[in-house]
Amino acid sequence: MNVKLYALIVASSCLFCCIAEGADLKQSFAEPPLKYATRPLWFWNNTAVTEEGIVEQMQAARDKCGYGGFGILPFGKGFKPAYLTEDYFKLYGAALSKAKELDMTMCIYDEYGFPSGSAGAIHGDGVRRFANKHPKGTIKRLDKHEEEVTGPCDWSKKLPAGRVMSIVGMEMKGKKRVDLTGMIKDGKVAWRVPKGTWKMMIFVCVVDGDPNVDYLDPEAVVKFVEMTHQQYYNRFKEYFGNTIDGTFFDEPTMYRAKGRMWTGRFNDKFKARHGFDPAPYYPALWYDIGTKTQAARNYLFGFRAELYATGFPKVIQEWCDKHGIAATGHQDQEEVVNPVSVSGDLMKCFKYQGIPGVDKIGGRAAERFYKVISSSAYNWDKALVMSETYGAMGDISWETIYHVAMEQYTKGVNQLIPHAVWYDNKKVSFKPELSWRHKKYAEGLQLYNKYMSRLNLMLQNDGRHVADIAVLYPIATLQAGHYLDGKLGHYKGGVAIPEADYVDVGEMLSTELGRDFTFIHPEVLDEKCSMKGDTLRLNNPVNHESYRVMIIPGHKTINWSNLKKIKAFYDNGGKVIATGTLPRKSAEFGHDEDVVRTIEALFPTSEKAAGESGRASASGGMAIFLKRPTAKALRDALDGMQRVYDVEFEEGKELCYIHKVKDGKHIYFLANLGKTRVNTSVALRGTLQPELWNPHTGGISRPEYSHGKRGTVDVTKVRIDLMPTRSTFIIAPQEE
């Protein structure tokens, strides 16, 4: 099944097509059906689970909390019955039977504990089920063995254990490299070292010892899926595509194996993809190898990110497509600015996954990265964006619960999975316990689920996202500046990239200026974007977007192919803003001079200390460089480039928002995430007949509004009055 069809069979997605069959949208908004409610993770935690307990808790979850289903998460050493045994599946079957009776839906959580990939070894019962059965299918690590020698001399070395990936000698002063990989004989490598100081390096791929599946190897992942997902299908086929509508994976990551995750067939697959041998470039994974460092790292780290994306998530997605259900899940440590040895590429890792996801957990600033994940969905034309939300945040207030949800939905999330309900509420490991048994939450959960159901009704759809601003996702500069064994440690990404201001720029746009945007992946800019007049178009069948401004956040290295297209956009009348640091290097071999020349053509005074510079093209294009980007500088630059944006707020009265277009309707969701009341006039491009739909109450009203023009552009001004942590929809038919 094509992944674009996944949402049609997912009850939790609640696409508009699900409403259309005779149902009245306004009536559904007032009293949303159960299928739009949230479905929390349900921890079967550190206790013996019984059929009686399952039935009782599911009934209460629906009747007392308004939940629409669950994702069952076996957890802890005390959980019984044993994972993946027939007794376990008997209980799971009881849960499915009760869910069907209650008209609830279920999502298969693919692990015992977390992260996904070991079948119980971590946060489960400690049994390494996958590793015990498939020891060669577990995570691999790239090791480097090195020594310095002074030539001329004879050098020889017995090969260390593991699969040899590369052997290179590098002269330390001039960075000359000699590939010795083909000189292996009888388990040794020998070479006559020329004059100079040389670093002799042997790179080997070894089994790490981590119990998780090799995320980079699709064949290994197939074996994991056979051990887990397939076992549910073998027993519960009749529930697939109805009661069971999806799977969920949790926290795979490449920071395992000391951040040096690798796989044995890396070189062979690299050659097949790129047409040249990566072995001579392996030293760049750790060291500066001269002028080719940045491009070499982009090829090597970029290909590892591709293997990661086509490994674990893609294999699971393909299995789900075949079995009529959806697939979602999220990475670990999404909050790391440099993801190269964590998720590899926080946009591309979701390229082949039907529903990209994120985890709002503890005090981590996941909200700064929601737009990266939702932009991945927009880039690759996906309807849904999931968030596992509230875990380990403690007994948070209702205000915080709503605030988090509003921020997520204004930034593109549209499938919130609460964390969590606990089978044994006396053994809660990660608060809050969001159930009828908790005094703080019991009375408010029904109201909360009605609110979330209304958000889902309106936003869980394949409507087209509208944004005037594109921001280039700077994976090229992140990969170019990255190296293995960085001083930050693998858990925090290893290496800080000083020019990487993309997260700050994104937050300025979203939370300070009230300007929505889409991160554009370099691959998508090359393959799916074209120019139409002075706009840049993202050419997706469903989520097609038109950008009037392109922002290049801080880069030292950029894809030459991207820069050529951005320059053509500027020449055609497009508007370009660059921030912080301008690129001087190409992510492709042989194009550094092209990058320098083009940047100078766009920003001729780019290195002046004044901080702002640029020029205009003959066709009306503008290019501005903000050396020290602030919210004010960014606002001034944007206002000078475009007369009217899609949505505009009065300065100092900005709200967070998202705008989608679906079935002839404009759907604007606005939220006040500040601490003071906002009474303001919101300017919407076009001549609209707006209504206010209140997700807190289900009420619908006609606001105060007026029509006017800015220059030749039609504008509708709508009066909005929102208290802190309150939200509203503006719904309007598309103008003729």
Residues covered by each model-derived region:
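Positively charged n-region of N-terminal signal peptides that target proteins for export
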Residues: 1-5
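Extended, Lys/Arg-enriched charged tracts that mediate electrostatic binding to polyanionic substrates
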Residues: 144-184
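Boundary at the C-terminal end of the N-terminal hydrophobic targeting segment
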Residues: 20-22
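Extended acidic/polar, glycine-enriched regions
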Residues: 173-235, 711-736
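Glycine-rich, proline-tolerant flexible connector loops at the mouths of alpha/beta enzymes
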Residues: 74-84
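Bacterial N-terminal signal peptides
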Residues: 7-17
